From Swiss-Prot:
It comes from the Bacteria. It is found in: Cell inner membrane. The gene is tsuA. It is a multi-pass membrane protein. Mediates thiosulfate uptake. Belongs to the TsuA/YedE (TC 9.B.102) family. This is Thiosulfate transporter TsuA. PANTHER family: INNER MEMBRANE PROTEIN YEDE, SULPHUR TRANSPORT DOMAIN-CONTAINING PROTEIN. Pfam families: Sulf_transp (PF04143). InterPro entries: Sulf_transp_TsuA/YedE. It catalyses: thiosulfate(in) = thiosulfate(out). The keyword Cell membrane applies. Residues 19-36, 88-102, 181-189, 259-269, 327-330 are cytoplasmic. The keyword Ribonucleoprotein does not apply.
Length: 330
């Protein structure tokens, strides 16, 4: 069933490209331009996923599998990842789908993202990951219809509540904010509400098909790039997440071509390649240190109510705002 990763990735790539979805922009634009369009898209998607993930778990199509809590890793890795995404000009999913659009700076960012992630996971920087690993929290959830046994702690497990309760409460608050506040105008047929629904549905499909393949997690980016590097360097086979990356690039490429938006684009200043390469490297190191990126933690972990994902996501945003301030506002 690992081939389903290619299908899910293809759909994911189409949604990302048509919705112009980048979490770097979603976080950064709120600070720099008071533009909440993409941030609303992200928040509404999280609300839909919170309800969808619990529902799919209850009917037996998946079990949520929150990432372990590691205060040091989540905080440091999250902040470094946030710094890197601004330098790279896109988040993990943003640079990945833009590879398919023909943006050459995204090629460099993605290349160094994968390199940084691979080096931290099993290469030259693996000593750092081993050191961070000692701070992993022993807290976990008990096995149930909702959660895999031994998975990381969640808001519901810490409070001793059925996951439906915090999921519905938080989702309601997110929806009230998204629909109760003024939205920054943007000319697009694929508006934030439609994009959110499509993104949540792809996330749900990703969790179901990934579970059937034995992976037991939803959408991700970092592990896929690591798998591609492993395949190139050690000739190891592609897994579900590696095929997902291939699918994202293909889906975004097809969507861009159909819309007449595919074009090889190069920066006016070649030094930009150095900047995005450094940014990609920081993102890769940060993502592995934090235990996930803006997709594995923010888009997939936060809806599972994972404490690690909420913590890492807060520091994604803080790191993003810090580098945005240094580059554009200082």
């Amino acid at each position: 069933m690992i081939w389903t990763g290619l299908l899910v990735g293809f759909l994911f790539g189409i949604v990302l490209q048509r919705g112009r979805i980048c979490f770097n922009s979603a976080f950064r634009d709120v600070l720099l331009f008071k533009d909440n369009y993409l941030f609303k898209l992200a928040v509404f998607t999280l609300a839909l996923e919170m309800i969808l993930f619990v529902l799919l778990s209850q009917v037996g199509l998946m079990q949520m599998n929150p990432k372990p809590l590691n205060l040091v890793g989540n905080i440091i890795g999250g902040f470094v990842f946030g710094l890197g995404m601004v330098l790279a000009g896109g988040c993990a999913s943003g640079v990945t789908y833009r590879v398919g659009e023909g943006l050459t700076t995204a090629w460099f960012a993605a290349l160094f993202y994968g390199l940084g992630a691979y080096a931290t996971k099993s290469g030259a920087f693996s000593w750092w990951l081993s050191w961070v690993g000692q701070f992993k929290s022993p807290l976990s959830v008990e096995e149930s219809a909702y959660y895999v046994k031994g998975a990381g702690p969640t808001i519901s497990s810490v409070l001793g509540l059925n996951p439906w309760i915090p999921a519905l409460v938080i989702a309601a608050l997110f929806i009230l904010w998204a629909f109760g506040t003024k939205t920054t105008s943007r000319e697009t047929k694929f508006n934030w509400k439609i994009a959110s629904v499509c993104l949540a549905l792809v996330a749900g499909l990703g969790f179901i098909t990934s579970t059937l393949s034995g992976r037991k997690y939803g959408l991700g980016i970092t592990g896929g790039w690591i798998n591609l590097f492993q395949g190139f360097l050690t000739n190891s086979p592609l897994n579900w997440e590696g095929l997902e990356i291939v699918g994202i690039i293909l889906g975004a490429g097809v969507a861009a071509a159909v819309a007449g938006e595919f074009k090889l684009r190069m920066p006016k200043n070649p030094v930009t390649y150095l900047q995005v390469g450094i940014g990609g490297l920081l993102m890769g190191i940060g993502a592995v240190t934090a235990g996930g990126c803006n997709i594995g933690h923010f888009l997939t972990g936060v809806p599972q109510l994972a404490l690690s994902s909420w913590l890492a996501s807060i520091f994604f945003i803080l790191g993003n705002w810090t580098m945005a301030w240094i580059l554009f506002r200082r």
